[in-house]
Amino acid sequence: MAEFWGCRGPLNDLSFIQDHVERAVFETGATLVEVLGNRFCPYGITVVAVLSESHLSIHTWPEKRYVAVDVFTCGTKCKPQKALDHLRGVLKPRKVEVVTLSRGRKTGIVVTSFAKSGAYCKLSDE
């Protein structure tokens, strides 16, 4: 998860944000399933990229020059930091804060393989 403050990129341009979300997904090595986006009135954008490995979402507040980004991936194939690096490069924030969470470890969920339709998981106590 990342927060970008003082962004100087076009935060209210849906096509721009969608295009760069797709590019960010490509940078991670993830498998893109679908991209959904919405522009809010009077301003603000949400774009969600559904991935075989999970998702990437971005929410913009142009009036605050603020962006929230979540990159949630399973397994070791994807490199989520590359998505953040790409978005940071095009949105040009003055300040960035990143929090990394390891999800599922305490539940024993282990991703065993990926398929075009998504990840196959098993519980470690099975």
Regions found by a protein language model. Give the residues of each.
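Polybasic/polar functional segments that serve as interface/processing modules
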Residues: M1-E126
